[in-house]
């Protein structure tokens, strides 16, 4: 099982590259890597990013998005790594701007996936908040690759397009025993300021 850290965004709203922003002196991407490593669930943790940022990560396992799908958002990162690892049975996806994700959240979602896998033939297990799904904290089966490829070849790179074609189930973020901010995206500087005040 592989983990994909999505870190190829342009971070326009934040004002600088979010992957290298810090919480308590630790970069977002380093925090996420450390959390994923702590679960002992993954045989490989891969950072998915663009050519401009790739050399800035102090981490050996960085993959640049497929050149045919530059600037097509997070789906391009998932597509690129799935294509490179056709033998893999499962991929966990997390965005780099979710620095407070916990190992407990990852393992809880995995247990949810396993318990529903046979009965529902799930392709995707994701979290949801107030009925809104969070596609960038989710497990994806390789079966999702076809729908992702189709979306990338269309003019609509949204996860909704992909999810409509797949067997998907959701776990509520409140079902995780963790601080309420564990799944929050940091989109703006004031989001980070608010988070730091809570810590």
Swiss-Prot record:
Enzyme Commission (EC) number: 2.7.7.77
Binding site for Mg(2+): 97
GO biological process: Mo-molybdopterin cofactor biosynthetic process
Gene3D superfamilies cross-referenced by the UniProt entry: Spore Coat Polysaccharide Biosynthesis Protein SpsA, Chain A
The UniProt record lists the keyword Metal-binding: yes
Key words, A-Z: Cytoplasm, GTP-binding, Magnesium, Metal-binding, Molybdenum cofactor biosynthesis, Nucleotide-binding, Transferase
Catalyzed reaction equations: Mo-molybdopterin + GTP + H(+) = Mo-molybdopterin guanine dinucleotide + diphosphate
Residues that bind GTP: 6-8, 18, 65, 97
One Pfam family per UniProt: NTP_transf_3
GO molecular function, one term: molybdenum cofactor guanylyltransferase activity
InterPro entries on file: MobA-like_NTP_Trfase, Molybde_CF_guanTrfase, Nucleotide-diphossugar_trans
Record-linked HAMAP family: MobA (MF_00316)
UniProt similarity note: Belongs to the MobA family.
Domain notes: The N-terminal domain determines nucleotide recognition and specific binding, while the C-terminal domain determines the specific binding to the target protein.
Protein name per the record: Probable molybdenum cofactor guanylyltransferase
Organism: Staphylococcus aureus (strain bovine RF122 / ET3-1)
């Amino acid at each position: 099982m592989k983990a994909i850290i999505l870190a190829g965004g342009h971070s326009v709203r934040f004002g600088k590259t979010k992957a290298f922003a810090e919480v308590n002196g630790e970069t977002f991407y380093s925090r996420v890597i450390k959390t994923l490593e702590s679960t002992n669930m993954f045989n490989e943790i891969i950072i998915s990013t663009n050519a401009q940022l790739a050399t800035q990560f102090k981490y050996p396992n960085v993959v640049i998005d497929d050149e045919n799908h530059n600037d097509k958002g997070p789906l391009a990162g998932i597509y690129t790594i799935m294509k490179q690892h056709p033998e893999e049975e499962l991929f966990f996806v997390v965005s780099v701007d979710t620095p407070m994700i916990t190992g407990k959240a990852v393992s809880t979602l995995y247990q949810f996936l396993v318990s529903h896998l046979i009965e529902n033939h799930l392709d995707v297990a994701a979290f949801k908040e107030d009925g809104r799904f969070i596609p960038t904290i989710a497990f994806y089966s390789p079966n999702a690759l076809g729908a992702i490829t189709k979306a990338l070849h269309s003019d609509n790179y949204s996860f909704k397009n992909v999810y409509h074609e797949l067997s998907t189930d959701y776990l509520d973020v409140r079902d995780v025993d963790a601080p309420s901010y564990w799944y929050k995206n940091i989109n703006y500087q004031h989001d980070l300021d608010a988070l730091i005040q809570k810590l």
